[in-house]
Amino acid sequence: MIWPTSLVVSGDPIRDGSQSTDRQLAGADRLRSMSVETEAVREATDEVVEAFARLLPQLSTKAKRLDHEAVGRLTGTSTNTLLVARVEGVIVGTLMLVMSPLPSGLRAHIEDVVVDAAARGHGVGRALIDKALGLAADAGARTIDLTSRPSREAANRLYERAGFRRRESTVYRVALD
């Protein structure tokens, strides 16, 4: 039987309405006791495309829906590593680790971390961050950076608990679209 993806935390169900999985996560106690598994994804599967359709809007309302081709571009380059986190086989979080070989050394950057709203606070984000830190260290990266809006208070606390420190730096951006 195919169940809609549904996570229930503190009695508050969050449903995406999709029929993308045959597993249903329910109950804050069950979620807390489940193990989080992380893995690097190297190809654009239906499951990953569907996970982005569900998760990416929770990160950015302006992000465009990713199709197989777009996910393939993300996973098809040696500088990118797409990490996913699963609970009971269901993808509940993603993180993009970008490695940049520079004249000053290999640098790593974490981008687009998103954990399903109902799975937040249960170790999913930390599992993704820890996996990314390990991969970057194993690759010989000198540093690993990420940016996060100040309004994402819980995420910022997570990053600080994981060892990230705020830098005295200014981020500049030019909109190209």
Q: Where are the predicted features?
A:
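Conserved active-site alpha-helix within GNAT-family acetyltransferase domains
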Residues: 126, 150-168, 174
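Low-acidity, Ser/Thr- and Arg-rich intrinsically disordered low-complexity segments
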Residues: 1-6, 10, 15-20
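Conserved GNAT acetyl-CoA-binding A-motif
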Residues: 136-148
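Glycine-rich acyl-CoA binding loop
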Residues: 121-126, 136
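Conserved N-terminal entry element of GNAT/NAT acetyltransferase domains
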Residues: 18-46, 177
